[in-house]
């Protein structure tokens, strides 16, 4: 199960952020 406002995809939880980020930046941000 994912936290509220997060969605489940292929065994992982994701969240959409208002500000665009590159994958590398997103990984560091998480």
Swiss-Prot record:
Transmembrane segments: none annotated. Used for quantification of normal prothrombin (CA-1 method). Residues 1-30 form the C-type lectin domain. InterPro entries: C-type_lectin-like/link_sf, CTDL_fold. Keywords: Blood coagulation cascade activating toxin, Calcium, Cell adhesion impairing toxin, Disulfide bond, Hemostasis impairing toxin, Prothrombin activator, Secreted, Toxin. GO terms for cellular component: extracellular region. Expressed by the venom gland. One of its GO terms (molecular function) is toxin activity. Disulfide bonds join 2-13. It is found in: Secreted. Belongs to the snaclec family. Heterodimer of a metalloproteinase subunit and a regulatory subunit comprising two polypeptides disulfide-linked (14 kDa and 17 kDa chains). Calcium-dependent prothrombin activator. This protein may activate prothrombin via recognition by the regulatory subunit of the calcium ion bound conformation of its gamma-carboxyglutamic acid (GLA) domain, and the subsequent conversion of prothrombin to active thrombin is catalyzed by the catalytic subunit. This is Snaclec carinactivase-1 regulatory subunit 14 kDa chain. It comes from Echis carinatus (Saw-scaled viper). The lineage of its organism: Eukaryota, Metazoa, Chordata, Craniata, Vertebrata.
């Amino acid at each position: 199960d994912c936290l509220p406002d997060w969605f489940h995809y292929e065994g992982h939880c994701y969240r959409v952020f208002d500000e665009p980020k590159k994958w590398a930046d997103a990984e560091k941000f998480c």
